[in-house]
Amino acid sequence: MRTLWIVAVWLMGVEGNLYQFGKMIKHKTGKSALLSYSAYGCYCGWGGQGKPQDATDHCCFVHDCCYGEVSGCYPKTAFTLKFENQDIICGDEDPCNRAVCECDRVAAICFGENVNTSDKKYLFYSSSYCEEESEQC
C-alpha cells in the first residue's frame, strides 16, 4: 500500500504539463505522445543533443529551445488551456504558465504539420547517432 501511495504522489508531480502536452499532441496529430514522440530522434524525449534528424525531431529541438527561453519558469507546471475545433488556446493569466503552454502549443502544431514525415527508424533512436554539432537556438 505504501508503494502505491508513493507512485500516486510521484505521478501527481509528473502529470501536470506532460499530460496536457500529450493532449495537445493527440489533438493535432491523432497520435499518442508517449508512443510516437517520447523517444524519437535526437531531441524528442528527455534531453537532446546533436543535429535534429528530420522535421519531427526539429519540432522537439525548437520545443527544447522554447523551454530554455522561459527562464525562471518550471516547464512541467499545469496550465489552463482549451480546445476549440482544431485550435489550442492557452488561457492562463500567469505569465510563466502561459509561456510554457505556448511552447507546448507551438510544438503540437509543428508535430501536426509534420505528422506524415516522421520515420519509424528514428523511434528509440540511439543517442550515439546524435554526435553532430547542434544548430543554435
Swiss-Prot record:
Enzyme Commission (EC) number: 3.1.1.4
Molecular functions per Gene Ontology: calcium ion binding; calcium-dependent phospholipase A2 activity; phospholipid binding; toxin activity
Gene3D superfamilies given in the database record: Phospholipase A2 domain
Tissue and organ expression note: Expressed by the venom gland.
UniProt key word Lipid biosynthesis: no
Free-text cofactor note: Binds 1 Ca(2+) ion.
GO biological process: angiogenesis; arachidonate secretion; lipid catabolic process; phospholipid metabolic process
Other comment: Negative results: does not show cytotoxic activity on human fibrosarcoma and melanoma cell lines.
Protein name: Acidic phospholipase A2 CC-PLA2-1
Higher taxonomy: Eukaryota, Metazoa, Chordata, Craniata, Vertebrata
